[in-house]
């Protein structure tokens, strides 16, 4: 097997099949694998004991960590053949989806605190770190201790500084409901700042905005993939998204607003949303966040032979296939990766989205270019200077 799996630091030596789904726009990824279960073996009895919420780590073919999580579910099977234990769970940070703020951590209201402050306090209750980052992983090119590695471009530094400023900007007053999950509360706050709530391979929570200017990792075509698909959900999209701020106690009778436009939608389709908390200046971020959310109505699927276990959510790939209406060398961001492995075949399925679906702009690239349009779709400064527009020709 290409992967190495450990439970509480001990290697699982006889797993036969499974899947790992890494997600960007989520606070947790998921895993499942099947392993031979020797019922009389004391080590197996301890390793596969249910309801212990044991720690799991998964390493790729180069023995780099790609997943840190918690075992949730056990399913045991016994028949005339092999006895198997089927183990599944989610990332370390996934617990935030399942728990509300404990009574011991009340009050539920926060005054004059940033989302970083609030997230640090709530995630810290479960031993989870919170990191401000423009990378979906910490394997390479990661923001470390608030400093950007020197090789990162100036534009990327600017993106990171903008993200850091928003993550540390103050909410006047916010409040969680007693039954609301910690994840839902943090996601609500993050959306008002146009920040993505994500996680990395260590199970840390990320306050995240992607680096839209990164170069593509791979170039995928009809010829080097097993399957491709494209779904365009026009009903979910609008040309103009207006955000109106509810009048506050301090600003009674005053309603501020901002508008963000989706340049992919030429027909006039306006909508208006209400910003229920935050500052008056948050309406622009709120509008961009709504456009970003709507852009997820464009979904690209790519199925590949083998395990692409060095690709990670948040990275860019190029896709060129006329049959899914991708006439240009279109840039898409990896939103999810599902790696399926067993004794007979390994496959990887990518879920791709428009990069601006994590920012709302400021410019949304024309992914709808066709051969009747002016040839302005190739972005040489973002792609390699060769005819294939890729920086990894080994995939071709």
Predicted feature residues:
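Well-ordered beta-strand positions in beta-sheet-rich domains
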Residues: 65-70, 86, 217, 301, ...
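Charged- and aromatic-enriched interaction segments used to assemble
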Residues: 84-232, 393-396
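Short, acidic/charged, Gly/Pro-enriched secondary-structure junctions
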Residues: 1-10, 40-77, 108-129, 187, ...
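Residue-level detection of beta-strand scaffold positions
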Residues: 29-33, 137, 349-351
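Assembly/oligomerization scaffold segments
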Residues: 1-105, 192-194, 224-225
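Flexible glycine-/small-residue-rich
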Residues: 35, 89-91, 209, 245, ...
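Extracytoplasmic
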Residues: 15-17, 26-30, 66, 82-84, ...
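Acidic, small/polar-enriched beta strand-loop surface segments
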Residues: 2-6, 108, 187, 191, ...
């Amino acid at each position: 097997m290409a992967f190495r799996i450990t439970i509480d630091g001990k290697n699982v030596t006889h797993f036969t099949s499974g899947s790992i789904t890494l997600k960007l726009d989520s606070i947790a990824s998921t895993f499942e694998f099947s392993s031979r279960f020797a019922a009389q073996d004391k080590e197996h009895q301890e390793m596969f004991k249910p309801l212990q919420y044991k720690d799991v780590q998964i390493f790729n073919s180069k023995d780099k960590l790609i997943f840190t999580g918690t075992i949730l579910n056990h399913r045991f099977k016994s028949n005339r053949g092999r006895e198997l234990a089927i183990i599944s769970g989610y990332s370390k940070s996934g617990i935030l989806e399942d728990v509300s703020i404990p009574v011991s951590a009340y009050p539920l209201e926060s005054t004059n605190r940033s989302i970083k402050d609030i997230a640090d306090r709530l995630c810290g209750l479960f031993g989870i770190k919170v990191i401000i980052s423009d990378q979906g992983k910490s394997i390479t090119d990661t923001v470390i201790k608030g400093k950007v590695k020197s090789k990162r471009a100036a534009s990327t530094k600017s993106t990171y500084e903008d993200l850091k400023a928003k993550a540390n900007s103050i909410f006047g007053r916010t409040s969680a409901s007693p039954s609301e999950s910690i994840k839902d509360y943090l996601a609500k706050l993050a959306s008002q700042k146009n920040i993505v709530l994500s996680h990395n391979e260590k199970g840390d929570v990320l306050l995240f905005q992607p680096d839209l200017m990164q170069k593509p990792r791979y170039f995928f075509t009809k010829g080097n993939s097993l399957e491709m698909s494209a779904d365009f959900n026009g009903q979910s999209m609008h040309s103009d998204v207006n955000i109106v701020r509810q009048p506050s106690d301090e600003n009674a009778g005053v309603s501020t607003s901002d508008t963000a436009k989706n340049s992919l939608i030429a027909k006039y389709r306006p909508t208006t949303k209400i910003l229920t908390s935050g500052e008056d200046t948050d309406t622009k971020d709120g509008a961009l966040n709504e456009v970003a959310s709507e852009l997820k109505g464009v979904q690209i699927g790519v199925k590949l032979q083998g395990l692409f276990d060095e690709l990670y959510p948040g990275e860019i790939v190029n896709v060129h296939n006329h049959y899914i209406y991708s006439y240009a060398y279109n840039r898409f961001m990896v939103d999810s990766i599902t790696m399926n492995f067993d004794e007979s075949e390994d496959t990887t399925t990518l879920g791709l989205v428009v990069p601006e679906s994590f920012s709302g702009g400021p410019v949304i690239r024309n992914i709808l270019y066709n051969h009747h349009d002016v040839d302005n779709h190739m972005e040489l400064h973002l792609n390699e200077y060769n005819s294939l527009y890729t920086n990894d020709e080994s995939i071709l």
